Amino acid sequence: DLMGETYDASLMPDRLHPSSIGAGRMAMHLCHYLEPTTEKANPCTFAIPGNEYRSAAGWKEGADWHAVSEEITQILSRKKLDILFLGNFITQGFGGSRELVTYKPGKAAVDSCFKDLTWESAGISGDRTENLLWRLRHGKYGTSKPAYAVITIGINNVNAGHRAADIAEGICAVVEETRKQMPETQILLMGLLPAGLEKTSPMRMKCDSIHSILQCKTWGDVVYVNPTSWFVQA
């Protein structure tokens, strides 16, 4: 404990040097001091690569965010898909054919449900909207020409302390970039999975606020799904 507060070892494992998560937290807070004062920038829409490197992210030892991102790009450049899953750790857990991903708890279920379809997971552990936005712009995912793209992103922005309105704007930016890169693809946007044990927990309330914003959007041919009821008992 530090002055009565519980020490968060995920941020500074050796109590001196920040982890990738801690470095991201530092950068986010520094941004508030260094950004122009005339207009507050939205970090959720500013496309940047990720900074994760830990094997605990479900990757082979020695792999980092850039290696994992490049593997996705290479895989998608070689195949045409029926379904492309875009997202973070939840989507990464579907597995697909990626060799750098060692933890694939959802692969058997996805294989069973979509056994007659060609699909791939482009999820990366720890990714926020701004990281997926960067990958969409630089990874040339559109070469796989998926019939469907399923997007699940934003919970790590909640964890990072971003505002609900900013997160919703970041999610919308991801949808629009997907439309731009894959104009013939049908997009299914799956909203945030519920977080927090209680309805009144700050994380749950922020997720609900994001759902409320997204549900009011005019999506056109994009299908928006709120999965909260799949996991939460009334």
Question: Language model features by range: what are they?
Answer:
Residues L2-L16, S20-L86, I90-S112:
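N-terminal secretory targeting modules
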Residues I83-F85, W119-S121, Y224:
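Conserved beta-strand scaffold positions in the cores of enzyme catalytic domains, especially
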